[in-house]
């Protein structure tokens, strides 16, 4: 199974059309990767599908950076 960061990175690159080099743990979805609120909702849905988990709206609001997403997923696997 691929590393969580690799899988999250692939989803971000595919969904947002950014270069893989831009996807760092510190990168903010909105500020650094140019995601709008709809992009973030779609990203959360794809992460839920990819990792077979449910992310509540309250938790999703706390996921601001790539690192937040990776840490959230790792803590629930």
Swiss-Prot record:
Carrier domain sequence ranges:
2-77
Where is it chiefly localized?
A: cytoplasm
Q: Name one GO cellular component term.
A: membrane
Q: Record's SUPFAM superfamilies?
A: ACP-like (SSF47336)
Question: Part of which pathway?
Answer: Lipid metabolism; fatty acid biosynthesis
Single GO MF annotation: acyl binding
Post-translational modification summary for this protein: 4'-phosphopantetheine is transferred from CoA to a specific serine of apo-ACP by AcpS. This modification is essential for activity because fatty acids are bound in thioester linkage to the sulfhydryl of the prosthetic group.
Highest taxon in the source lineage: Bacteria
| GO BP terms | lipid A biosynthetic process
UniProt KW keywords: Cytoplasm, Fatty acid biosynthesis, Fatty acid metabolism, Lipid biosynthesis, Lipid metabolism, Phosphopantetheine, Phosphoprotein
Which spans are transmembrane here?
A: none
Where O-(pantetheine 4'-phosphoryl)serine occurs along the chain?
Answer: 37
Q: Where in the cell is it found?
A: Cytoplasm
Family named by the database record: Belongs to the acyl carrier protein (ACP) family.
HAMAP family listed in its UniProt record: Acyl_carrier
Q: PANTHER family recorded for this chain?
A: ACYL CARRIER PROTEIN, CARRIER DOMAIN-CONTAINING PROTEIN
What the protein does comes down to: Carrier of the growing fatty acid chain in fatty acid biosynthesis.
**UniProt name for this protein:** Acyl carrier protein
Source gene? acpP
């Amino acid at each position: 199974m691929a590393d969580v960061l690799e899988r999250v990175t692939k989803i971000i690159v595919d969904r947002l059309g950014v270069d893989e080099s831009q996807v760092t743990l510190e990168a903010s979805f909105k500020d650094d990767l140019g995601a709008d609120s709809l992009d973030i909702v779609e990203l959360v849905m794809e992460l839920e599908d990819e990792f077979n988990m449910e992310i509540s709206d309250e938790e999703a609001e706390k996921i601001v950076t790539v690192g937040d997403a990776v840490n959230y997923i790792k803590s629930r696997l």
